[in-house]
Amino acid sequence: MAASRSVSITYVPADCGSIIPGKSKAPQAFRDVGIVNKLKDAGVPSIFEHHALEAPATFSATTFSAGGARNEDINIAVCEAVERTIGNNFGATGQPDFQLILGGECCMLPAILSAFWRHANSQSPPQRVGLIYIDADTDLTSPTDPSSIGTFAGMNMAHLVRLPGALPRMEQFSRPSGEPVCDASNTVFFGTNMSLPGNKPEHFKYLFDKNFKVVSSASVAKDPEQRAKETLEFLQDKVDIIMVHLDVDSIDPGTFPLANVPNFTGVEFENMMRALKVLLGSEKVGGLTVAEVNPDHDPGLKMTERLTSHIVEMLAARK
């Protein structure tokens, strides 16, 4: 079932999954630049706002045990609240609204996809959910990796595909069958920085051994629209509903340093927006997550407003 032209916005003010504060301010920054009024002015018929958390879930310095994560309890509580909120959003209307989730952090994604899978499974016939993971990082660090520093956000994809060593408490975010929400049949890595030291050879070995589709940042920079079209074609016959995840560290910080941690991907802001426009133009896309925006890097919120304006234009153009 295609999403309607109405938009449900879910705000997730959290930065408890990393070691740099600031991302918890991003949802309010999107509100401060007028995202709701911009959507109304652009002709989006209905906009609904939802707050997944009663208060921001903020970073605090803490230790962690081997095989675990820093601030594990609060991170899992955030995921539980997000899954509950998105599930309620789906139950509120017959034809689901387009889900726009504004973080916050990438590590809320297992909860989002779990809610999407549960909604998809309730359809007749049951539907399949796909993910386009726009991120410079593979985020495949297992909690049991000897080099792990306990950063929950860096374990994001490890929990999505349920790598060995993934936190047992994250298994609740799954398909209704109990399987992981992501595998090579329904997931595309888009804009991956192949030269980033944090993307280790063993991460790429896992992806290629499992036949994941990986679209490098260099190839996105070269031809954004074509890479986006190829990504949609890859998923076309494999899934019925697509979630797009935009981690803004996929955008090169040379001229757009909005991300929490800079990542020199070579993909300029306008090029990433060209790719995103193609992706959001697909009728199968039912949601967009925006993560890793740090307003502390954006005095005056000019970059946040620029990003917001592009997203609004894309959502307003949806049929």
Annotated model-derived regions:
Residues 2-319:
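Conserved alpha-helical scaffold segments that buttress catalytic/binding sites
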